[in-house]
Amino acid sequence: LGVFKRNVLNGWCVSISMVLTESTMVKLGSPAHGFSLPDTNGKNVSLSDFDSDALVVIFTCNHCPYAKAVEDRLILLGNDYQGQTDFVLISSNEIENFPDDSPEKMAERHQTKAYPFPYLFDESQEVAKAYGAVCTPDIFLYNKDRKLEYRGRLDDNWKEPENVTREELRMAIDAVLSGNEIDFDQVASMGCNIKWK
């Protein structure tokens, strides 16, 4: 009831069958953890494959309405920052009970939506645990030294893109690329809980 009440006050409500989860807000300055995970073509992609001055790691999935609501905005960001910032999407959901998040469905979505970034499958869920990811979407921005600079929401209105007034992830990326500190409060991302095994 408390969660429902809070969300109504924020102007939206959540299906009773959905578990709304808030990001754990991992400590700033934490290092990016190494990984080697298959993309939608079955090719392994590693942390070391990314060499831009900024790296955005996003834990997401196909079926979550929160993830789907911001998907087009993430694609726009990925296109806007090509050559300046690397983006990588990772799905860590267990797929026996959530078949829409299977590698086959991930490949379909990657192609249909023309993702400008790789979409990786974390079958063991070890990468999500290493990063401290708990929800979809859960967003982490790292600097050129792969230290965490930002962990928070994409913007200030996940549900209504036309009413967004603060694009916080874009603001954070711009700060990192220019070598400036992120000088605004970082608000936790919220979404569906990662579906653990």
Question: Model-flagged regions — what are they?
Answer:
Residues 16-186, 193-197:
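Chalcogenol-based redox active-site neighborhoods
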